[in-house]
Amino acid sequence: KQATCSIPYEYSNGKFKRTLYYSNGVYANS
């Protein structure tokens, strides 16, 4: 799945790991 807005995905251990990104003053866990 592609991340929306500015939420980066870290690829580790062959699996997409969800990253907590600080955007617009709100923590978005996508």
Swiss-Prot record:
The keyword Secreted applies. Its main location: secreted. Keywords: Secreted, Toxin. GO terms for molecular function: toxin activity. It comes from the Eukaryota. Expressed by the venom gland. GO terms for cellular component: extracellular region. It is found in: Secreted. The keyword DNA damage does not apply. This is Hainantoxin F7-28.42. It comes from Cyriopagopus hainanus. The lineage of its organism: Eukaryota, Metazoa, Ecdysozoa, Arthropoda, Chelicerata.
